[in-house]
């Protein structure tokens, strides 16, 4: 080691020495142990984003996100209790401790990483546009002056604002309200996750998806900062599901096709 390297190493040592202490302060008590002691996992989900989260014909919570969280709870060894969240409420509810984790079609972004942590990616989707079948709109280039609705507090809202700055964008609290605006003719376009838009188009005649994918949206399970125990539990669950074939089965049941992006499996 030359003199310059020795000087740089010496200068870094005080900073490096503080890292374990900072990490310990963020981690706090073992959250998984707390969940076991409580006897249930408290999970935040949406009920208005099929096939990720919705209420079935019997008014029971269902969906891909919920099935992932049921598997996490089984991995920990407790039942799961679902709490309805919105794009606006999901992070505050997580940070306040009202829920242990959240899977609500939430995109993993650098901005959100300043506030919360994420599991590994469990689904990769993208943003698109839904319009009436007789609409002349074919893509973002046609949106100037058009009434566009989107879900509030999402990356979708930011993306459409950037790609179509001259559109008349209105943000709604949830997908159902945004969809209703389109269905009733109070909007020209609904922009959102492609898979969710496909669900609306499939269940309601007279609408079509246009414009291709506007973005790539990696979904992750949201966790409190430094909650390594819960992050490990979620990541282990996802990898075990992939290896056993359970993930592919759930995916095909929800989306009607095999997974497009594999879950990364780490060596034991």
Q: Where are these predicted regions, by residue range?
A:
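N-terminal export signals
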Residues: 5-24
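Extracytoplasmic small-molecule ligand-binding "clamshell" domains
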Residues: 27-105
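Short helix-initiation/N-cap motifs at beta->coil->alpha
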Residues: 66, 82-92, 135, 154-155, ...
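Extended ligand-binding regions for polar small-molecule ligands
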Residues: 66-75, 141, 146-147, 154-155, ...
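Acidic, polar ligand-binding/catalytic clefts
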Residues: 70, 74, 79-142, 211
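A ligand-binding cleft/hinge motif common to bilobed small-molecule-binding domains
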Residues: 89-92, 105-114, 159-162, 183-215
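Periplasmic-binding protein-like
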Residues: 123-131, 177, 194, 198-238, ...
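Ligand-binding clefts/hinges and TM-proximal coupling segments of bilobed small-molecule sensing domains
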Residues: 155-172, 209, 239-268
């Amino acid at each position: 080691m030359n003199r310059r390297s020795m000087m740089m190493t010496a200068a870094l040592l005080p900073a490096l020495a503080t890292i374990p202490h900072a990490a310990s302060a963020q981690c706090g008590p073992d959250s998984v142990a707390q969940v076991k002691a409580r006897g249930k996992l408290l999970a935040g989900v949406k009920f208005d984003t099929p096939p990720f989260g919705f209420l079935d014909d019997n008014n029971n919570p269902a969906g891909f996100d919920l099935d992932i969280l049921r598997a996490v709870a089984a991995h920990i060894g407790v039942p799961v209790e679902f709490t309805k969240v919105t794009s606006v409420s999901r992070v505050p509810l997580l940070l306040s401790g009202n829920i242990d984790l959240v899977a609500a079609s939430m995109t993993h972004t650098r901005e959100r990483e300043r506030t919360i942590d994420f599991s590994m990616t469990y689904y990769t989707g993208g943003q698109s546009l839904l319009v009436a079948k007789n609409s002349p709109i074919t893509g973002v280039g046609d949106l100037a002056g058009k009434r566009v609705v989107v879900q509030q507090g999402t990356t979708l809202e930011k993306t459409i604002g950037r790609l179509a700055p001259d559109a008349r964008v209105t943000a709604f609290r949830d997908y159902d309200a945004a969809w209703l605006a389109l269905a009733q003719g109070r909007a020209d376009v609904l922009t959102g996750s492609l898979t969710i838009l496909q669900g609306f188009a499939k269940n309601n005649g007279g609408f079509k998806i246009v414009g291709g994918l506007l973005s790539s949206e990696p979904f992750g399970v949201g966790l409190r900062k430094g909650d390594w125990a819960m992050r490990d539990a979620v990541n282990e669950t996802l990898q075990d599901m992939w290896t056993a074939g359970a993930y592919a089965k759930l995916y095909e049941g929800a989306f009607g096709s095999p997974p497009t992006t594999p879950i990364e499996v780490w060596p034991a």
